[in-house]
Swiss-Prot record:
Entry superkingdom: Bacteria
Function: Catalyzes the reduction of dihydromonapterin to tetrahydromonapterin. Also has lower activity with dihydrofolate.
Pfam families in the cross-refs: adh_short_C2 (PF13561)
Xref: InterPro entries: NAD(P)-bd_dom_sf (IPR036291), Sc_DH/Rdtase_CS (IPR020904), SDR_fam (IPR002347)
Cited Gene3D superfamilies: NAD(P)-binding Rossmann-like Domain
EC numbers on record: 1.5.1.50, 1.5.1.3
GO molecular function: dihydrofolate reductase activity
Active site feature: Y152 (proton acceptor)
Family indicated by similarity: Belongs to the short-chain dehydrogenases/reductases (SDR) family. FolM subfamily.
Reactions catalysed: (6S)-5,6,7,8-tetrahydrofolate + NADP(+) = 7,8-dihydrofolate + NADPH + H(+); 7,8-dihydromonapterin + NADPH + H(+) = 5,6,7,8-tetrahydromonapterin + NADP(+)
Enzyme class name: oxidoreductase
Protein name: Dihydromonapterin reductase
PROSITE patterns: ADH_SHORT
Organism: Citrobacter koseri (strain ATCC BAA-895 / CDC 4225-83 / SGSC4696)
Amino acid sequence: MGKNQPLPILITGGGRRIGLAIAWHFLNQKQPVIVSYRTHYPAIDGLTQAGALCIQADFSTDDGVLAFAEKIKTHTPGLRAILHNASAWMAEAPGTPLSDVLACMMQIHVNTPYLLNHALERLLRGHGHAATDIIHFTDYVVERGSDKHIAYAASKAALDNMTRSFARKLAPEVKVNAIAPSLILFNENDDAEYRQQALNKSLMKTAPGEKEVIDLVDYLLTSCFVTGRSFAVDGGRHLR
């Protein structure tokens, strides 16, 4: 890495949807990007060709998380930011042990960012006042709860709480914030009836797309003062 080259931004779960859009946003700005991915989608090849460093990671175990952190250290002496976007969505369902559901959700949404923030702390420090960032991607359900995804909601709530704890620990060098989205974009196979029902849950009645999140990420990275806060991107859904 050249002396004048910007420090890379690490995006976990950057192979699809919002993580992928954020990765492309930074690549288009000539900002170096490191992307973790679990499953090799065709989009990973596109990111690699555009200059991103894409690393397959297994966050299902603590050992896998720590092994990924060690790989990061071999590629860069510092990081501009860590965006914790890797996520899984698992409901309590008949036939699936509840302890497995809870363990899975806590592993990806709590253990993984907790261990990575500690393991990569040295790469975030030493660059100046408010010079680097951690952004946790949580969820709208942190505020409301969910009767069908109880473990998921609980794990995202824990991640939300860690935002404030890490903000206290890492200030003033590192800013730590959270983004709590609800519906941002649909899946290709979502039918018209589902889409309309989902849109009606917010005051704004629209799926804004990735740019709404990207603009917020840009704001948080450029701010020299904001830390320890969670930013809802929910179209007023909490008022319905």
